[in-house]
Amino acid sequence: MAVKTYQAGVTEYRQSYWQPDYAPLDTDLLACFKITPQPGVDREEAAVAVAAESSCGTWTTVWTDLLTDLDYYKGRAYRLEDVPGDDTCFYAFIAYPIDLFEEGSVVNVFTSLVGNVFGFKAVRALRLEDLRFPIAYVKTCGGPPNGIQVERDKLNKYGRLLLGCTIKPKLGLSAKNYGRACYEALRGGLDFTKDDENINSQPFMRWRDRFDFVMEAVQKAEQETGERKGHYLNVTAPTPEEMYKRAEHAKEIGAPIIMHDYLAGGLCANAGLANWCRNNGMLPHVHRAMHAVLDRNPHHGIHFRVLTKILRLSGGDHLHTGTVVGKLEGDRASTLGWIDLLRESFVPEDRSRGIFFDQDWGSMPGAFAVASGGIHVWHMPALVAIFGDDSVLQFGGGTLGHPWGNAAGAHANRVALEACVQARNEGRQIEKEGREILTAAAQHSPELKIAMETWKEIKFEFETMDKLAIANK
């Protein structure tokens, strides 16, 4: 074995981090970055700069390089691809040895892959498009505490999508009035009601008062309907200690499910709360507040499919995924891609849906996809077709905005859902025949008829900012 010697100075990154003949190992963590280099910086130079800075490189040679095996620990840029329709940027594929990352810590993965490298001067913009987590790493993560089947068993609800409602106005209600709004929606036919992500413990409604009034409403609705009900009690808090205090109280008063903002609250807090839920038999509903800051710019940030994978590893039984048809951003093909990444046990590479790598989840359970944001009864046929059964449809204004009140709005949504599920099961093309299906159901439901009349002109037709960059969509 040759003796390694130290030579001070600066070595070009490409001498160590560009390896186009590298065949990624099954145990490698693979990343796809979209890189927009600075003028005058060629593609290879930009790619290897990202590979070095996100693994074990630094700007100059250091003598401590001799104390380790950099050839093993380094990230390797192994392939570059054009971005269809955009010659200002390119895709760089980088392989990282699994030993660079702490087992079961998505926090540590993000510290390296979306850390200082995103401020690197060699690149004008940088976006993490996708990650392939090797099964050896997946098995070190906790994942969803319950999973889809366990949640259905807890709720005794099968064969259809679940229905929910975010209570509005999202800020300003007293705890007692808030509980009343929950009760009306639950007795009308919803499975869940939900705290808005903005609701924590403000002066107009402290968290303990809200929890107590809401659980009184849940239990009363259960007694009247004979169905299992729930409310997503938001335990997101200023500190982890306060978060666990709120979670413990939710458990004490019989709540089956709690809620956490996993990006605003932090990945470390989310993983800890998921472990607590696993140990205490609770369901964690996860909201994605803050995601658009990270994922909406098509050239810089983190794609939501990556945030979806991170959540599944970190732990959550529900995740908001967008609606395609509602008021929030979301391309249909991309949305279907990250919904599969959330729910399926194996998802193959599929560039038509923006999936750059095969992803094997092993035995890790999946989670419910949650559609929320500007949806109403007219969207029901499309939502059932797009999302499938293992989903939760959250109608906020589409429930509480009904002219006859919350219970009528909930009833209208339940009738519309059951009509669409029945039509689908009969083999009908529910997206094409949606108007006919809903109109027929409304003949027996005045609540649905009024809802259809109220929102018949409401559409959210805006161009998607983050479009799939594929050659043949």
UniProtKB/Swiss-Prot annotation:
Cofactor: Mg(2+)
Protein's name in the database: Ribulose bisphosphate carboxylase large chain
Purpose: RuBisCO catalyzes two reactions: the carboxylation of D-ribulose 1,5-bisphosphate, the primary event in carbon dioxide fixation, as well as the oxidative fragmentation of the pentose substrate. Both reactions occur simultaneously and in competition at the same active site.
Site residues (Transition state stabilizer), renumbered to this chain: 327
Sites bearing N6-carboxylysine, chain numbering: 194
Lineage, top ranks: Bacteria, Pseudomonadati, Pseudomonadota, Betaproteobacteria, Nitrosomonadales
Active site: 168 (proton acceptor), 287 (proton acceptor)
Gene Ontology molecular function: magnesium ion binding; monooxygenase activity; ribulose-bisphosphate carboxylase activity
Keywords for this protein: Calvin cycle, Carbon dioxide fixation, Lyase, Magnesium, Metal-binding, Monooxygenase, Oxidoreductase
Binding site for Mg(2+): 194, 196-197
EC number(s) recorded for this UniProt protein: 4.1.1.39
Keyword Iron: no
Cofactor remark from the record: Binds 1 Mg(2+) ion per subunit.
GO biological process, one term: reductive pentose-phosphate cycle
Record-listed substrate binding positions: 116, 166, 170, 288, 320, 372
Catalysed conversion reaction: 2 (2R)-3-phosphoglycerate + 2 H(+) = D-ribulose 1,5-bisphosphate + CO2 + H2O; D-ribulose 1,5-bisphosphate + O2 = 2-phosphoglycolate + (2R)-3-phosphoglycerate + 2 H(+)
Miscellaneous comment text of the record: The basic functional RuBisCO is composed of a large chain homodimer in a 'head-to-tail' conformation. In form I RuBisCO this homodimer is arranged in a barrel-like tetramer with the small subunits forming a tetrameric 'cap' on each end of the 'barrel'.
Family membership noted in the UniProt record: Belongs to the RuBisCO large chain family. Type I subfamily.
Quaternary assembly: Heterohexadecamer of 8 large chains and 8 small chains.
